[in-house]
Amino acid sequence: MLSARSAIKRPIVRGLATVSNLTRDSKVNQNLLEDHSFINYKQNVETLDIVRKRLNRPFTYAEKILYGHLDDPHGQDIQRGVSYLKLRPDRVACQDATAQMAILQFMSAGLPQVAKPVTVHCDHLIQAQVGGEKDLKRAIDLNKEVYDFLASATAKYNMGFWKPGSGIIHQIVLENYAFPGALIIGTDSHTPNAGGLGQLAIGVGGADAVDVMAGRPWELKAPKILGVKLTGKMNGWTSPKDIILKLAGITTVKGGTGKIVEYFGDGVDTFSATGMGTICNMGAEIGATTSVFPFNKSMIEYLEATGRGKIADFAKLYHKDLLSADKDAEYDEVVEIDLNTLEPYINGPFTPDLATPVSKMKEVAVANNWPLDVRVGLIGSCTNSSYEDMSRSASIVKDAAAHGLKSKTIFTVTPGSEQIRATIERDGQLETFKEFGGIVLANACGPCIGQWDRRDIKKGDKNTIVSSYNRNFTSRNDGNPQTHAFVASPELVTAFAIAGDLRFNPLTDKLKDKDGNEFMLKPPHGDGLPQRGYDAGENTYQAPPADRSTVEVKVSPTSDRLQLLKPFKPWDGKDAKDMPILIKAVGKTTTDHISMAGPWLKYRGHLENISNNYMIGAINAENKKANCVKNVYTGEYKGVPDTARDYRDQGIKWVVIGDENFGEGSSREHAALEPRFLGGFAIITKSFARIHETNLKKQGLLPLNFKNPADYDKINPDDRIDILGLAELAPGKPVTMRVHPKNGKPWDAVLTHTFNDEQIEWFKYGSALNKIKADEKK
């Protein structure tokens, strides 16, 4: 086994030269850390050729990767937007908050080790408080039980483990594991970040990860392909982030649902690999299954810079037939973006698809009465923490410093990985930020996911923050519903920190230097890759031991952080009748509303405790309040989890009624485990976000959609619900919902669903995990 970082400290080698002794039959490792995981390009091409003969049409790049990973290329039905594909991903990546439940589920399956390469990354449990080293030490102390569990479980079941301080999962994957043409799934919704290296990287729930860990095919509804044609070249203050911010404004938060976003056109060759990663990362904010760029020179340069030149050379041998779209490949729809005319965007507040070009922000902010003083500027996160991001932001800081200016706001910097932190420390950007007044946070997710002990304002104070993050839902970053959070490029965030004003436009507006003289900030500049190569920094990787027989994984029965799982009961074979509505949620109901992160992250391995946050952020249509619902039997108003428990403890099934794009946001399967644990039976909505809908199915719940969305408005919180015809539940066949109003005659509504035959078995068995265990016994 190679040392975790031994091969990464090497100078950049630019160019397209191919290693002469490589052939298309060569065995090439997927990465520098695992000896026995090889790139399967030849098998992918053979599988793809079978499908090509069947379909007899040109393929997009995304289709090539998908069809090259089919479990049964001869028999698989393939219709974009219709079929369910059975796929064989190359590997799995898990972050520490979702890994706990994924591993607990894997343990309950009783298997000796994972069937595919798996890594676990400690990035979600580190709270930003005072700064990097102190925050990291505090997190290691607070989360020792969880980290010890993950370290021992990964060792026991043959997984790689990245310790706290390593960095954010997606940056680590890009630096070490991503390669063109691969298919990876990850238990985090921003897994698509790896699309910047030409990989199909898809966010999933933990139960999906368990399928692959157990050696089973993984199922995905065949996505449609949204082609985004990029022409021209960016200049000045425009950055890759602005492409996805503009696209979010065009498509909205659900415009990518059921689709892969594939970028093409001459503009794709103008970005760095990390810039392409930024664009793919935030495709999650439009609901896309994933996003991807075709293999190109920038990817070769990044692979070489990170010690993986052999992979780059191997990929060149498969460029035409596997790692690029066919000529005349057809997309289901196409959006065109002219990079020459693209300007910087600021998206928000409260939703990532409210897109405002910087030239319009002044008038829009004033018209909407948004707080104009920027209180905090935050750069970094999995979306924007590359060497290029940090270098370009540092160039702006240096320009301001030359005029005697420092940050007018609180300014935080989150390095994406230990490698990035060590490199920008060596090259001086870190010191530049500190002199500017910046606070360098730990190599972790931090404020982006609500891990922020913010103390400069009180909860309820109206204020504005601007970050280079990806999400800006209400209360997400700091728990304050009055924080107006905007997302932008790190360059623009830095400019706002200097000006301290949301109305500032660095393209047109002047600042005053320390002597009162006016000047304009110069456009940002910076290297895409470090000229002296990357500095690996501290070794933070734990490889699984060769002998795992003596490794013990312990979970204390008295722990409040970890809890072994008990199987959910199978369906009783009967229609569900007279069910109360736990809550009729109105408006945006994201996974942050359903299962809040922040202070609740510490309970992600303990289903009973984490269930105390179920739907506490959702707004009740009856009274427009959060976490205040009526028990229809007692008339008492209580919190949502308390009321759900009251129903469950009396043996009463219940339903939730939801609005559009229910479950938007994170991949966290806790948002599906919790309603199942609390006795829920069905979640009935106008529409679902992809990952959440799948997670609900995996846990034996019924995600159902109103055929007529207007029926949502006809339902009252006091109504009782029957779900009829479940014995005949079949793919494509609607079910009947009978509504019993408190006063009035019953009425019926048609509910649709997306269940296929196997998913119906999950429902009948009580969960997908129950089905796996039953199959293992056969």
Swiss-Prot record:
Q: What induces it?
A: Highly induced in the absence of glutamate. Induction is further increased when both glutamate and lysine are missing.
Q: Which family does this protein fall into?
A: Belongs to the aconitase/IPM isomerase family.
Q: Which UniProt keywords apply?
A: 4Fe-4S, Cytoplasm, Iron, Iron-sulfur, Lyase, Metal-binding, Mitochondrion, Phosphoprotein, Transit peptide, Tricarboxylic acid cycle
Catalytic activity as recorded in UniProt: citrate = D-threo-isocitrate
Q: Which residues does the annotation say bind [4Fe-4S] cluster? A: 382, 445, 448
Enzyme class comes to lyase
Q: Which domain of life is it from?
A: Eukaryota
Q: Which SUPFAM superfamilies match?
A: Aconitase iron-sulfur domain (SSF53732), LeuD/IlvD-like (SSF52016)
Tell me where it resides: Mitochondrion; Cytoplasm
One GO molecular function term of this record is:
double-stranded DNA binding
What function is annotated for this protein? Answer: Catalyzes the isomerization of citrate to isocitrate via cis-aconitate, a step in the citric acid cycle. Can also provide minor contributions to the reversible dehydration of (R)-homocitrate to cis-homoaconitate, a step in the alpha-aminoadipate pathway for lysine biosynthesis. Also plays an essential role in mtDNA maintenance. May directly protect mtDNA from accumulation of point mutations and ssDNA breaks as a component of mitochondrial nucleoids, or by preventing accumulation of iron citrate thereby alleviating its detrimental effects in mitochondria.
Task: Give the UniProt entry's GO cellular component terms.
Answer: cytosol; mitochondrial intermembrane space; mitochondrial matrix; mitochondrial nucleoid; mitochondrion
A single Gene Ontology biological process assigned to it is: mitochondrial genome maintenance
Q: Does the keyword Transmembrane apply?
A: no
Predominant place of localization: mitochondrion
Q: Transit peptide positions?
A: 1-16
Q: What is this protein called?
A: Aconitate hydratase, mitochondrial
Organism equals Saccharomyces cerevisiae (strain ATCC 204508 / S288c)
> Which pathway is this protein engaged in?
Carbohydrate metabolism; tricarboxylic acid cycle; isocitrate from oxaloacetate: step 2/2
Record entry for activity regulation: Subject to catabolite regulation.
Which residues are recorded as modified (Phosphoserine)? 391, 556
